[in-house]
């Protein structure tokens, strides 16, 4: 899925902009580091619930998070 490629890149970029490790982000939204790693490597897609949490955490829209212009 094309949005998945944009999402994984956007997620990693947003995380690094905040100087967060995968463990810190995982704790902030209630998932494991492995889940963050799978999302960032495009091995798994987040459920809508986590997209909402991530968008709120990074103060961006879901559209921005998944790369919909």
Cite the ranges covered by each PLM segment:
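Residue-level signal for the short linker/turn that defines the boundary of a DNA-recognition helix
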Residues: 9, 19-20, 46-49
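Short alpha-helical DNA-recognition segment
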Residues: 19-38
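DNA major-groove recognition helix of helix-turn-helix/homeodomain DNA-binding modules
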Residues: 49-64
